[in-house]
Amino acid sequence: MKSFETEPIEDAAAADSASNKHELGRLGPSSSEKSTTIEEEISDERDVVDSDLVVYEEKAEDEVPQRRRFSPPTREQLLTWIPFWGVILLGAVLRFWGLGDKPLHHDESLHAYYSLQLLNNMAHWTWCINPPPQGYSCYIYTPLLHGPFQFHFIALVYKISQLLGAPDNGVNTTTVRILAATLGTGIVALPFFLRDYLGKVGAWLACFLLAVSPSMVYFSRFAREDIYMAFFTLLMVVGIARYVHTRKMRWLVITAAGFAFSYATKEATFLTIMVFGSFLGALIAWELGLKAPLRSRFNQESPVVAWLPKSFAPVTVLVYFAIAGVAAKYLFAWIKSVSIYITDPNNVNAANNYVQRLKDITVAIVPVIGILLGAFVLVLLYREIRGKVVVAKRRGLANKVDPERQPLLDTILTMPWTHWFFALLCAWVIFLLLFSVMLTNIRGGIGDGVWQGLYYWLQQQQVARGSQPWYYYLMLIPLYEQIGVVFGLLGIIRSVVQPTRFRLFLVYWFVGNLILYSWAAEKMPWLMIHITMPMLILAAIGLEPAVVTCINFMKNLFARFSSPKEAEALHANDGYAQEFPKARPKVGIFATSISFLGVIMAVLLLLPTVHNMYEVAYVHPADGPHEMMVYVQTTTDVNTVMAKVDALDQKMFGGKHQMQIGLTGDATWPYAWYLRDYPNVCFDFPTGCPGWKNVPVIIGGGDNPYGLEQQYGGATNNPDKYTYQLYKMRTWWDEGYKPPATGGIGPGLWLSYGDNPPLNAKFNLGLAAQHIWQWWWQRRAIGDTGGAYDMVLFIRNDLSTAVKP
């Protein structure tokens, strides 16, 4: 595949050394370099771009295959890698420590249960192709459970755990969350590959902030699809950035894989497409405008001319956003109208039939496209083997593009088209395998994979699950992410004042996600990570100058009081030498003082941030009333109930899981997963099994547990009396911050007085600050703590003495 890469192989040290020198010509300088305006170009980078074109024009048959030779890492590489490996290890420990301690959330139990079903399906996969035996069900993609990615890979974790001899035959609360913790750790590692854009210190800071972020840690210990999507989104960012920088095909393939996996994870990928696609359009508009001079068209002696931009680039971007803004307005209005239409009971059948026709057309066309694409790639591989690959050359529109000032257009117009085909093939294979459930449901998987997710997402805009106000994330994120919020704002300011394309992209990504997720009907705490992730990278950009200045000062101070040999050794072969050059001009005392104050402020803000992370991830992970981020969570009472069920089964059947259990419909989740080893469970009890009598155990849930008590525990016509035990299945955070129209009192009064403000009370800043402070350090709830969903355990009287009360 060498001839497709279009770049010679570089070792990591060489790549690090070369990349910072020509960053602005690609997407902007590293953060340690002196920033310039986005219209300026670096003339001495022409040789780098020209070398790229020389590689493009080489004949494939003239290339000499190069073999990678193993060589031990250099001191410079070690000094670069060790700090990153240290913070990645920190992130892994925070994510894997006590991973299975918390009971499974309602949604986690669904994901765990159907992943286990998929694992069992793979043992009899032919039954899922042909009509299965009566009573045998196969997992198929349904957007109600979101994308198929997590079910395939959690099932894979189950299988690996079984092979390794993990407890409970490899299926337990820990193995359910291993995938989330693994990809959450991967998020911590990914900024390492953005060193050319963030600088080494900036990249390390991004890794560290992601490692200790309360939201990133908590939801990396939570088997929901959002942490997977966040990983794949950041993987796309890394892949695109690295591809524009190196032109190596593997990075474009990684980008395509990241997109395909994200699409196979959650429908919110549509929002990612909106943000990334609109920024791509703005960047293309900017680069198109760069070729048209503006200032030079006017009289240079006029004082007004000096205020004009050099080119039409700002004008084209303004025009682009004006058009895009109007288009977005109509798009959102269309989405709303379509959502209302398809959820109207009078239109449901017509909407379903229309979507089914779209699926049928897609199923007829997409496989043919996939086969043709695969055949084309096979031809390319054959020609590669024969040494007859045609390498892309600069021709046509590419001749009119300035590689330095228009790197994106240059990338698009001069890249080998083989890169696109391999990337598309990679995405197509991932889509087909996951949505067809490993080729067991090809027709349904293709049609549903293309249309059903979008259809479901449009329907959910009217459901508005959670009914949260527009300011939900503006309350939630500052409560937990103190260092991220403060330095994220500083990062935005720095990115605007000292812009590079990558910095502006991060700002656009953060602001775009904040707006879109606040606009979307469904607002949940797990969605906050799509906002906090770019915010934390911006926080690294905001904090980096102060850290660099302080490290520089300490190194220079050490060198002043060291021998010349020690001072030379301090700077020689330094993995961060490019960010702390020996010839760097002295920084003024005032600037140094400001930098030290900035670092001190960062440490002070880090304290509540880390404290919040510790509290939500390890102290109150199953305590909804005391953690806004937890929102609603299964309580540890579920473990208590299961311990009693297991004890009864041990008493009656020697632990063979043969006991009959009645499970009412309101208690199905999470108990469908917790009772997975009990084959004699009657779901939707008692209507689900009218012939069952004298059931040893009944588990019920609902808003009226006392009605269940009357039915099974105290009814005079019930000869088989049951012992009644009341527990809490789920608890939740108080929602008094909602506006009065949706049952709250508003955020100001709620923060000031809780749920019961005095008559004619107004927002009180002092009381609000006091309540937030008490919540930060004592976890004293702001509102009511009694919100709960009850459950009832009934044990037949003749067995009640077999277990402890």
Model-identified regions with their sequence ranges:
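Solvent-exposed loop/turn segments at secondary-structure junctions
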Residues: M216, L514, A667-T668, T687-G688, ...
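Periplasmic/luminal catalytic loop of GT-C fold multi-pass membrane glycosyltransferases
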Residues: L433, C689-D784
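Phosphate- and divalent-cation-binding pockets in alpha/beta enzyme and binding domains
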Residues: H152, V485, P670-Y674, G707
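Flexible, charged surface loops at secondary-structure boundaries
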Residues: F421-L425, K651-K656, G688-N694
